Amino acid sequence: MAKGLIGEKLGMAHIFNNDGKMVTVTVLRVGPCFVSQVKTEANDGYEAVQLAFGDAKEKHLTKAELGHIKKANIATPKKTLVEFKGFEGVAVGSEVKLADIFALDDTVKVTGTSKGKGTQGVVKRHGFAGGPAGHGSRFQRHPGSIGSNTTPGRVFKGLKMGGRMGSEQTTVRNLKVVKIDADANLVFVSGPVPGRERGIVTIEKIG
């Protein structure tokens, strides 16, 4: 992962940009993030920085997780740990601020967990057109044929069918940073991002 931060999705809104045009944005509360571990080529085989985000109660964390946070001299337990690359000269226990990473008009990508939709059919899940809607049709939202007869005598793997939809890691790329409120740790990015409100996301700088 590239240089970035952890945050949560607060919701969507409309704001006016400098040209007076209304822009649809998603509001993200990014940080405060603290460095919980610095991984090096010598010790771990690769270089990365692990950031911690989101206060948690001690009873909700394991002893190993609590010990990991305590070793990093972070005052309060954190519930989310994510590794990023591209950081230089950061110390364990230090805070990484929003203004240190992002600026206006930056191009970013946002990764989150998409909303769970439960069990859905092929029309909603895969965008199938479906059949005729009337005049005696019995084929409306059905998937249709799933294979041949004796040959090959089986259903090929990967065939699009109904099933569980959503609750998957999803990334949206090439979003623009429209506005930043460093005091409130808020980032306004153009367009929608995956996940529900209060869902955890990572925002990474592109380029």
UniProtKB/Swiss-Prot annotation:
Belongs to the universal ribosomal protein uL3 family. The gene is rplC. GO terms for cellular component: cytosolic large ribosomal subunit. Keywords: Ribonucleoprotein, Ribosomal protein, RNA-binding, rRNA-binding. This is Large ribosomal subunit protein uL3. One of the primary rRNA binding proteins, it binds directly near the 3'-end of the 23S rRNA, where it nucleates assembly of the 50S subunit. It comes from Leptospira biflexa serovar Patoc (strain Patoc 1 / ATCC 23582 / Paris). Residues 129-152 are annotated as: Disordered. Pfam families: Ribosomal_L3. It comes from the Bacteria. One of its GO terms (biological process) is translation.
